[in-house]
A protein has these predicted regions:
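General beta-strand structural signal in soluble alpha/beta enzymes
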Residues: 28-33, 49, 72-73, 127-131, ...
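Helix N-cap motif at beta-to-alpha junctions
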Residues: 187-193
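Active-site-proximal betaalpha loop/short-helix elements
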Residues: 3-6, 105-179
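Glycine-rich anion-binding loops of enzyme active sites
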Residues: 1-85, 210
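Solvent-exposed alpha-helices and their adjacent loops that cap or buttress functional pockets
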Residues: 22, 37-42, 61-65, 118-122, ...
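Short, compositionally biased
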Residues: 82-101
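Acidic, Ser/Thr/Pro-rich beta/coil linker or hinge segments at domain junctions
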Residues: 201-248
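Active-site glycine-rich loop that binds ribose-phosphate moieties when present
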Residues: 46-60, 95-119
Length: 248
């Protein structure tokens, strides 16, 4: 869905970008439809994907077990940061040097985690959970809820790029609740082994905590203990709310 003021060239550019990414990743686009919709200020894209895998290759988040380590692969908030740059590039250009924003744009191709998932499938990972809308805090909750387990994690071990922190500070956003597609939580009894294997491939990975019996979901930060809350709305929603208020 596109705003009524969007040009046809915008739709064509979106389809070219989708086609290029699919070609690079060995995917096919079977069908695409588009329409102009009143009342929206930005393009909305819905994707339905279909794939096949052997049963033993499926590593659903509900397969996580208590007593295993939680490994965070890649950086939290990266996708959200790139989307903020696209939405608020002009505002950010007033605060940051061009080299800063160009460096972030160069990271766009690095958010994909397909290689990391291949490695995980061969290294004893019992469960995986992608970090999407709502950020890592939502992903941790959803993973624990789906598996019926608890967890204990440390915020200081969660990998986040300094650029993401600085962009979030401009708009007073929480990077831990920012959409993070491309980052993945992996649960394994051999966390250190998996981390080192991924790092040898140049893939950022850190052990951020472990799963536990029961339902307590604990986050440690600054020496303080707190309990993980139910997922809050993604911080990107605040960006769109700000844009709507400006345009109102």
């Amino acid at each position: 869905m596109l705003p009524t003021f969007a040009y046809e060239s915008r739709l064509k550019a979106m389809m070219v970008e989708v086609s290029e990414i699919c070609k690079e990743k060995g995917l096919r686009v079977f069908f695409a439809d588009a329409q102009s919709v009143n009342g929206i200020q930005t393009s909305i894209v819905h994707v339905t994907a279909h794939g096949e895998a052997k049963k033993e290759q499926l590593l659903a988040s509900r397969s996580a077990k208590a007593g295993e380590e939680i490994v965070l692969v890649k950086w939290i908030g990266m996708e959200g940061t790139l989307r903020i740059i696209r939405e608020e590039g002009a505002a950010l250009a007033e605060r940051f040097a061009p080299g800063f924003l160009n460096k972030l744009e160069d990271m766009r191709d690095e958010i994909f985690s397909d290689r990391a998932m291949e490695i995980a499938g061969r290294n004893g990972v019992s469960a995986m959970h992608p970090i999407g809308e709502g950020g890592i805090l939502a992903a941790l909750w959803d993973m624990a809820e789906g598996a019926g387990i608890g967890l204990s994690v440390e915020m200081k071990k969660m990998t986040v790029r300094q650029e993401t922190i600085e962009v979030c500070e401009v708009f007073h956003l929480n990077p831990y609740q920012l959409t993070s597609t491309g980052a993945v939580l992996m649960v394994t009894p051999k966390g250190e082994e998996l981390k080192e294997r991924l790092k040898r491939e140049g893939i950022p990975a850190e052990i951020i905590g472990h799963t536990t019996e029961g339902n307590e979901r604990i986050i440690w930060g600054g020496g303080e203990k707190r309990f993980l809350d139910r997922p809050a709305p993604d911080e990107l929603a605040r960006i769109y709310e700000m844009k709507e208020n400006v345009n109102a």
